[in-house]
UniProtKB/Swiss-Prot annotation:
Membrane topology: Multi-pass membrane protein
Taxonomy of the source species: Bacteria, Bacillati, Bacillota, Bacilli, Bacillales
The protein's name: Lysostaphin resistance protein A
Keyword Transmembrane part of the UniProt annotation: yes
UniProt function note: Involved in bacterial cell envelope homeostasis. Regulates peptidoglycan processing, perhaps acting as a scaffold protein.
Gene Ontology molecular function terms on file: endopeptidase activity
Disordered: annotated segments: 278-382
């Protein structure tokens, strides 16, 4: 399933409104076929109903970009591959039908052999236009909307049922209507498988298959005139090819899944085994889970390393405290050395003062002694 921006209510309303408008317009437009003056086998005006319904829904509901996600006109290798299949599968269906006619019927009837007053080019252009407007509504819009909430396979079933109701033909009896319903349903399922995992590039593939089938049926067989055998052959041929194509596609995807050890979503998005994966996790899922755990552990380790680097850049309080204490010890030691030096200077100064004082006293004493001696000598002489 795709990621959806639609609420559940809006999703349901878009599908419901599309269905109602399509069915109502198919009844209304049918009465205007004679008015436009174009034969029904060239262009059926009723086929405009899904196109108009899609346009109305796009204009009415929000998230228009998401509504138009199924209408991309770019080309990829996968689109070219599916285009080739869209042209080959109708050939296979018609070959099976022709073989059945040659085996079980006397002949087959060319439809309207007496009334083909329109050129082949006009018929081809008309069928391409019919295929485009129908598939724009049912594939590019409706199936795209359905795939936002459900698996591609089941979305194709829903679209197939709505398309079969839209094209139902009860004019020629119940049995004929039953085979016609089977034919249109398998017709739609084949297109649903063809457009799988094309990322919105659906319109080329769906239009090519649709136009190829309807254009060939204009000339071959006689189902349009109510021939039950023709309708039965076409319905069964389409069913055989459709079932075989879906089964082969599933087998190929399963082989790729087993050989590459990928999940089916990686092999092909929106696969119809996704619900089995949810219920029964495989070994590959377990290995992918373990790989995810390992990667998450590596991410955790990397985060721890980054945190350590970040913390290493932050100032550490304990380091600051140690640095401050070291600074204090250095300052105290410097102060002690300064005090010691100052005390030594004071002691040296005091010693120098004492020495100088003692020398002065001694000189005075010597002078006194000399004076006394001189006086004594003077007295003796008198």
């Amino acid at each position: 399933m795709k990621n959806s921006r639609f609420s559940g209510f809006q999703w349901a309303m878009m599908v419901f409104v599309f269905f109602v408008i399509t069915m109502a317009l198919s009844v209304i437009l049918r009465d205007f076929q004679a008015t436009i003056g174009v034969k029904r086998f060239v262009f059926s005006i009723k086929d405009l109903a899904p196109f108009i319904a899609a346009i109305v829904c796009i204009l009415v509901f929000k998230h228009r970009k998401e509504q138009l996600a199924g209408l991309k006109f770019s080309i990829s290798l996968k689109v070219i591959e599916r285009l080739l299949l869209a042209l080959i599968l109708p050939l296979i269906i018609l070959m099976i039908g022709l073989f059945s006619f040659n085996t079980y019927a006397d002949s087959f009837i060319l439809l309207q052999t007496s009334d083909l007053s329109v050129s082949l080019l006009t018929i081809l252009i008309g069928h391409i236009l019919m295929a485009f407007v129908v598939e724009f509504g049912f594939r590019s819009y409706l199936q795209n909307i359905l795939e936002t909430r459900m698996n591609t396979f089941f979305a194709s079933i829903v679209v197939g049922l709505i398309y079969s109701v839209f094209t139902a033909n009860t004019t020629y009896g119940v049995e004929y209507a039953g085979y016609h319903f089977l034919y249109t349903f398998m017709f739609s399922m084949i297109i649903g498988e063809l457009i799988r995992a094309t990322n919105g590039r659906t319109i080329y593939i769906a239009t090519a298959f649709h136009a190829s089938m309807t254009f060939a049926l204009v000339f071959l067989f006689s189902e349009e005139t109510g021939d039950l055998f023709s309708m039965k052959v076409i319905a069964l041929s389409t069913t055989i090819v459709g079932v075989s194509f879906i089964i082969i596609s599933l087998i190929i995807r399963a082989i790729v899944y087993k050989t590459t050890k990928q999940s089916l979503d990686e092999v092909d998005p929106n696969n119809y085994l996704s619900h089995i994966q949810d219920e029964e996790p495989s070994q590959e899922d377990a290995s992918s889970t373990s790989n995810h755990d390992v990667s998450s552990k590596d991410e955790t380790k990397q985060q721890d390393i980054d945190n350590d680097k970040h913390q290493s850049k932050k100032p550490n309080k304990s380091d600051d405290a140690l640095t401050t204490s070291n600074y204090k010890e250095d300052a105290s030691s410097v102060n002690k050395e300064t005090d010691t030096t100052h005390n030594d200077n004071i002691k040296d100064h005091s010693t120098y003062t004492e020495d100088r004082h003692s020398s002065v006293v001694n000189d005075v004493k010597d002078e006194i002694h000399e004076v006394e001696d001189h006086k004594a000598d003077t007295d003796k002489s008198h």
